[in-house]
Design a protein with these regions (language model features):
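Binuclear metal-ion centers of metallo-dependent hydrolases, dominated by the metallo-beta-lactamase
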Residues: 217-234
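Short alpha-helical
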Residues: 6, 26, 56, 80, ...
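Metallo-beta-lactamase
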Residues: 24-26, 79-146, 150-221
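Active-site metal-binding motif and surrounding structural segment of the metallo-beta-lactamase
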Residues: 28-79
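Short, basic/glycine-rich phosphate-binding loops at helix/coil junctions
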Residues: 13-14, 107-109, 174-179
């Protein structure tokens, strides 16, 4: 599902759903409408899985947890980030230093209006309860892909050939110079070398449908998409 410059994924199984990411805080109405669009509701969300705890992916996670008791799961290394024990978000200073770059200023204005700098911690984030496939609709398998943040995770659906890549591999962004599989621009990564290295992790996943955190759905071997992004990154 496409929000305002960011995506989330709804995995359905009977009456229950798994929600992967939640968009910006300002995307809440769109998020709830997207659940209704697939015949679901906030009460039916079995869990929120978070790729990483930036505001444009975490925006409504605490709302769902507090209002509906929805558990919010993410990698152990990302738990303190979700609580806002420390920031791994691009700083205002970094954005201002890069404001001359194409697309950065319009993106920044939109991000501010959508709650990009709002304080939206998850009060009780939870690490994945067990290794391997999660016992949730879609049976997603967390795949650790640090670099964008310390605890960034992609999610693999082996039986469906789907990879939900979050911001470890995207297919577009308002600040990007081109479309197609790529890393986000450098200013957004906590540790760019690790982000580049994790493209090799994604290349090992069997799939032909890439659902990125930003940009359109990408169809074709995920391996090829990851290799293309790595070539552009080097």
């Amino acid at each position: 599902m496409h929000g305002s410059n960011t995506n989330w994924v709804i995995l359905t199984e009977g009456d229950a759903v798994t929600l992967v990411d939640t968009g910006y805080p300002g995307d809440r109405a769109r998020l709830l409408a997207s659940l209704a669009q697939v015949g679901s509701s906030p009460e039916a969300v079995a869990a929120v899985l978070v790729t990483h705890a930036h505001n444009d992916h975490l925006g409504s996670a605490e709302y769902l947890r507090a209002a509906h008791g929805t558990p919010v799961y993410l990698h152990q290394a990302e738990v303190p980030h979700a609580r806002r024990d420390f920031p791994h978000q691009v700083s205002v200073g970094t954005v201002l230093r890069n404001a001359w770059r194409s697309g950065v200023l319009p993106w920044a204005v939109h991000a501010l209006r959508s709650g990009g700098t709002a304080h939206v911690p998850v009060t009780v984030p939870e690490a994945f309860p067990a290794p391997g496939a999660l016992d949730l609709p879609g049976r997603p398998v967390p795949v650790r892909t640090p670099g964008h943040t310390d605890g960034h995770c992609a999610y693999h659906l082996p039986g469906a050939g789907v990879v939900i890549s979050g911001d470890a591999l995207v297919s577009g962004h308002p600040t990007a110079r081109t479309g197609g599989p790529q890393l986000l621009p450098d200013l957004f990564h906590h540790e760019r070398p690790r982000a580049v290295a994790c493209l090799d992790v994604l290349a090992e996943l069997d799939g032909d449908l890439l659902l990125p955190g930003h940009g359109p759905v990408h169809r074709g071997p995920v391996r090829d998409a990851a290799h293309r992004a790595r070539e552009f990154a080097l």
